[in-house]
């Protein structure tokens, strides 16, 4: 806690407060020519989109400047990482500037689809002298501009503040999701005893989630020509859940993308029954949505584990620095061994996330009103990962302050 009161950390924290204030202010600016009184209907029909937007710094409840949030940007980063992991595609050989341009173009494409799908399904006001096409174009442009403004804001926060894009997402989650959970508790008329039990099990799960988040598997590492009688090994740490809570957050967003496409097609074919059924089946509470959600979490957890712990890079780095694992040749043998260990923990972590995020969501098949309560474990996983990420950043920034000068 002392680290937080260091001048550098306080300065960064104040900058972050300013950026958060700008974000909150922008989220209150409603889109022009939108019938705000009729937005509630869209929110009721698009619960999946509401939660997906909230997990990416967006807000579909008020249809504001930042309604689609960072979803296009974060989705493009994920897709790009999937491509760059494979050396065969050659994307990792591109210059950083070329990679950034391609990511931004991908962000623009995703933002255009999401913005257009939302605007075309918004209840728009009739304004004399202003055509519907002009209103659609203007609001689509505003939403895309809002996304790029948020990207710029998170870049500023990364360089001047704390947490980068994490802070925007955390503020979005804190602003809306606890309120939704409390409304569900009131709507379901849950008794104080059941509420106390939910609170107790939530605390138990929070403790378990923190343990799993920080749990690591250590591989002893030797270094050529270094002999230390006090410490025989250094270690390569591999987290048990290497993906963290990111797969749950990204899964909600990726599962919502098909809905945006269907909403876009529905505007051009409003009487198409298949499109309407597709939107309903992909909404929260449907079996197709549930299966797709869990499958996406499993795949993302597996993928993130190999992205976060790249066996190729680790093996190459160890070979260059003269490090080796006992009874293994440097190079290919080391790479295969690390890849095997990462694969094992990737499966364990993916299974853990599916159980944590999936089992509580079974409540929605009893009553859709349990949906918000069923999402509590998943929200805990996401939030814990964000908190520890900020803590690690603060620890890194104050690392030099832990050593005292000799003179």
Swiss-Prot record:
One Gene Ontology cellular component: plasma membrane
Keywords of this entry: Cell membrane, Membrane, Protein transport, Translocation, Transmembrane, Transmembrane helix, Transport
Transmembrane intervals: 13-33, 65-85, 104-124, 133-153, 158-178, 192-212, 248-268, 287-307, 345-365, 370-390
Any one biological process term the GO annotation gives: intracellular protein transmembrane transport
Pfam annotation, one family: SecY
Intracellular or extracellular location(s): Cell membrane
Gene3D superfamilies assigned to the protein according to its UniProt record, in alphabetical order: SecY subunit domain
Topological type in the membrane: Multi-pass membrane protein
InterPro entries named among the record's database cross-references: SecY/SEC61-alpha, SecY2, SecY_dom_sf
Transmembrane helix keyword on record: yes
HAMAP family reported in the protein's UniProt record: SecY2 (MF_01466)
NCBIfam families: acc_sec_Y2, PRK12417.1
Annotated function: Part of the accessory SecA2/SecY2 system specifically required for export of possible cell wall proteins. The central subunit of a protein translocation channel.
Subunit structure: Component of the accessory SecA2/SecY2 protein translocase complex required to export cell wall proteins. May form heterotrimers with SecE and SecG subunits.
Family classification: Belongs to the SecY/SEC61-alpha family. SecY2 subfamily.
Name this protein carries in UniProt: Accessory Sec system protein translocase subunit SecY2
Organism for this UniProt entry: Streptococcus gordonii (strain Challis / ATCC 35105 / BCRC 15272 / CH1 / DL1 / V288)
Lineage, broadest ranks: Bacteria, Bacillati, Bacillota, Bacilli, Lactobacillales
């Amino acid at each position: 806690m002392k680290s937080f009161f260091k001048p550098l950390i306080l300065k960064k924290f104040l900058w972050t407060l300013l950026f958060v204030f700008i974000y909150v202010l922008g989220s209150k600016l409603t889109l022009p020519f939108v019938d705000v009184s009729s937005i509630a209907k869209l929110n009721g029909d698009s619960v999946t989109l509401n939660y997906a937007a909230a997990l990416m710094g967006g807000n579909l409840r008020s249809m504001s400047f930042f309604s689609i949030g960072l979803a296009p940007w974060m989705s493009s980063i994920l897709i790009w990482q999937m491509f760059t992991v494979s050396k065969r595609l050659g994307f990792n050989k591109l210059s950083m500037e070329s990679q950034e341009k391609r990511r931004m173009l991908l962000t623009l494409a995703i933002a255009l689809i999401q913005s257009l799908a939302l605007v075309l399904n918004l209840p728009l006001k009739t304004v004399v002298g202003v055509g519907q096409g002009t209103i659609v174009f203007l609001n689509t442009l505003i939403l895309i501009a809002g996304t790029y403004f948020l990207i710029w804001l998170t870049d500023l926060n990364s360089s001047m503040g704390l947490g980068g894009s994490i802070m925007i997402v955390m503020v979005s989650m804190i602003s809306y999701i606890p309120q939704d959970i409390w409304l569900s508790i009131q709507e379901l008329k849950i008794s104080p005893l059941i509420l106390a039990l939910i609170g107790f099990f939530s605390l138990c799960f929070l403790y378990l989630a923190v343990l799993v988040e920080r749990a690591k598997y250590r591989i002893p590492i030797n270094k050529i020509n270094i002999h230390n009688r006090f410490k025989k090994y250094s270690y390569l740490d591999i987290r048990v859940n290497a993906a963290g809570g990111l797969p749950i957050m990204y899964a909600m967003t990726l599962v919502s993308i098909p809905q945006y496409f269907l909403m876009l097609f529905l505007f051009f074919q409003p009487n198409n029954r298949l499109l309407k059924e597709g939107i309903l089946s992909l909404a929260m509470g449907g079996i197709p949505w549930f299966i797709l959600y869990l499958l996406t979490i499993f795949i993302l957890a597996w993928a993130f584990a190999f992205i976060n712990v790249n066996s190729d890079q680790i093996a190459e780095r160890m070979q260059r620095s003269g490090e080796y694992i006992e009874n293994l040749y440097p190079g290919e043998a080391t790479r295969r061994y690390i890849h095997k260990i990462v694969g094992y923990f990737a499966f364990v972590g993916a299974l853990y996330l599916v159980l944590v995020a999936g089992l509580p969501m079974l409540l929605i098949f009893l009553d859709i009103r349990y949906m918000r309560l069923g999402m509590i474990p998943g929200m805990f996983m996401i939030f814990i990962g964000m908190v520890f990420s900020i803590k690690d950043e603060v620890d890194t920034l104050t690392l030099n302050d832990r050593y005292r000068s000799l003179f």
